[in-house]
Amino acid sequence: MKKSIETPLLLNTKQSQDEDKEKIRWEKMKKVASMAAPMVAVNMSQYLLQATSTMIVGHRSELALAGIALGSSFANVTGFGVLFGLSGSLETLCGQAYGAKQYHKLGSYTFTSIVFLLIISVPISILWMFMNQILLLLHQDPQIAELAGVYCLWLVPALFGYSVLESLVRYFQSQSLIYPMVLSSLAALSFHVPLCWLMVHKFDFGAKGAAASIGISYWLNAVFLWVYMKRSSRCVETRIYMSKDVFVHTNIFFQFAIPSAMMCCLEWLAFEVITLLSGLLPNSKLETSVISICLTTSSLHYNLVNGIGDAASTNVANELGAGNPRGARDSAAAAIIIAAVESVIVSSSLFLSRSVWPYAYSNVEEVISYVTDITPILCISILMDSFLTVLSGIVRGTGWQKIGAYVNITSYYVIGIPVGLLLCFHLHFNGKGLWAGLVTGSTLQTLILFLVIGFTNWSKEAIKARERIGDEKVWRHDSLLN
């Protein structure tokens, strides 16, 4: 009789626990999605800032388009990508400090980032002053190289504005203060488009005007966020102040900043290498055009899915800082599920419209036909990128930037690019082979990061996070270790 009474009680308890777990997962998915959606607007606005400049200048001449496109590529890899990667250190430090309620450290970490990013911008600026000569050494067309060099020179003020802006973006992101960034990004973009058109066409500054307008827009965005941070009551406890702590935090900042920059730059550089290699093929104009279309489409998708990655990074970092390993694990799982849904929707839509969407870039039938043929490979690439971007966000939130950097080197430079070279030049798959090499690298990278995250001991990571941000009351009790 006693056994018959206990059995339904046990079943009811188990059912209740399952329902609670399901409810928690659903709440985590809603939390990640509610942050990811506005972050997409922030990322896309920043991306369109440079993209619209290219489009506006491109209407002047084919030479102008080629020059600004080449200049943008090298500026992104040697400058903006470096700063973007370095600021990724704040996703770990600020995110975990906020979760641990060490609010004052957000301000000091962010100030440290601003100072060092501004300092690092100086040698990058000097490098850009010699961009023309560097491009000539790389056997680029002299006219295009000269225009790209002028564009990069006038882009130098944007570099310093970007240093401040990206640090502030991570500061706000760590606190889930997304809507101020949405407003500032959209305002900057709305200001930038007419300003760029006036400077390029009305005042006839050409590429110089486009670069200058980007710098003005970045600074405008940064000033807006700075004023909000200083004036808003929501930032009282985390406010940024000039402090000597910049030297105290130097070691821990660069501990995450350098591998974070490597993660970012190695991946961006791999895509640029593929674009340059396409120029060595027999029909280089066609091959480069197709690879550029694939790269632009992939970049647009990256800025879409990166919102999910940012949300994953913030939520995982906050939960680890709060000493909540189960919350961190559930946040990571929720972000991966959302990425899976997004990847299926985007890749299947692209595949089903493979004979239509290429017309958004070109009216040349030869280009349309080639892009249609390469679309299935591009769909696999987008499928992998969705997971990879979110997994990379989890890596940054946890503080595994070194692991991410090593995985990037192995995936792209030991496997991906060599496979692309083999398929392209030895087996004569041309541009398809180059892009297939990238897909091979991103697939391997995705699988490795899946394994790393799948076998993670989240309890240990929570303890590391609490120790990292200097919390004296590190949670080592049984609830943390279970």
Swiss-Prot record:
It is found in: Membrane. GO terms for molecular function: antiporter activity; xenobiotic transmembrane transporter activity. It is a multi-pass membrane protein. GO terms for biological process: response to wounding; xenobiotic detoxification by transmembrane export across the plasma membrane. The chain crosses the membrane at residues 32-49, 64-84, 111-131, 144-164, 180-200, 209-229, 261-281, 289-309, 332-352, 374-394, 403-423, 435-455. Keywords: Membrane, Transmembrane, Transmembrane helix, Transport. InterPro entries: MATE_euk, MATE_fam. Pfam families: MatE. Disulfide bonds: none annotated. GO terms for cellular component: membrane. Belongs to the multi antimicrobial extrusion (MATE) (TC 2.A.66.1) family. NCBIfam families: matE (TIGR00797). This is Protein DETOXIFICATION 9. The gene is DTX9.
